[in-house]
Amino acid sequence: MSHNTFGHLFRVTTWGESHGAALGCVIDGCPPGIAFTLTEIQAYLNKRRPGHSEYTTQRRELDQVEILSGVVSQNDGKALVTTGTPISMFIRNVDHHSEDYNAIMHKYRPGHADYTYDVKYGIRDHRGGGRASARETVVRVAAGALARKIVPGLIVRGAVTAIGPHNIDRDRWDWSEVDKNPFFSPDAQAACVFANYISQLCKTGSSVGAIVEIVAENVPAGLGAPVYAKLDQDIASFLMSINAVKGIEIGDGFAAAHLTGEENADEMRMGSDGKPVFLSNHAGGILGGISNGQPIVARFAVKPTSSILTPSRSIDIEGNDVNVMTKGRHDPCVGIRAVPVGEAMVACAIADHYLRHRGQVGCI
């Protein structure tokens, strides 16, 4: 299986399976001299970590990152500094129940990659989905923590804006609320609605989808290039690679199709500091594939978790009609824990383009 690497200059290769001994990544192209601590990386991993909320999977993983190469310790014994050589990180799996999947070893679970992996490779890891599991994204979050350090002042934040039929009220958007509830909701009232909805859903053994919004601030203007190296092109590609993601939009996205040219135009004026000021941000911070200095806004839709307790019709590897009921521990809404993953992928895309721009044009 190839295609386990993303990025051009800031290149991340991930490895490992859901029920293997560990998952890891190798980061190649990270500049030397980037200082960080394991505590900083762990903070992002903890946002994604399973088993600490009744609204996510009860698989309990510590998700403690270990670094094997590419850094040296500072005198304080806590801070690490990148050396410019490949950085290898891994996270051990400690709580997988592979026996839960014995009953579906020879059956294809609807909505999963079981059938397509089998068709392509002639073999698949039935234990938790193997490489197709969302468990793979844990090391992307670790890589994203480093990516944030590359672009000076970069802030990347994410939030859940909808779960199933329930949406947040954007007039109540408050970033300070995101870390106060298990749904990463910027709307405290919506978080209560999400809680009641997911609680009822869990009783039926079903699942539901979600919409996640990522906002990147302090992105310098000029990142990205026409025509086949657009910044929004890579952001969309990186986000689309996340498990269960089925749709992407940048800025107003599909809503822009319902606007007039006058409504959609991000008009400009010269600010008092001599720099241009945009009067709106329908484009989501990117024009012609190049960042314009405004916040970059991206949204992605996450489908309902395919593993549910409701029996589903399918076939087995011999072509027989069967019914499938997936046991194991699964997220009723996998979109919730996709928030830190989306943040990481956007951070990696921006860091990659920052280095590419610096290499082509010089200092930013």
Swiss-Prot record:
Its EC number is 4.2.3.5. Pfam families: Chorismate_synt. One of its GO terms (biological process) is amino acid biosynthetic process. Gene3D superfamilies: Chorismate synthase AroC (3.60.150.10). Reduced FMN (FMNH(2)). Its cofactor is FMNH2. One of its GO terms (molecular function) is FMN binding. GO terms for cellular component: cytosol. Keywords: Amino-acid biosynthesis, Aromatic amino acid biosynthesis, FAD, Flavoprotein, FMN, Lyase, NADP. It is an enzyme of class 4 (lyase). It comes from the Bacteria. Belongs to the chorismate synthase family. PANTHER family: CHORISMATE SYNTHASE (PTHR21085:SF0). Homotetramer. This is Chorismate synthase. The gene is aroC.
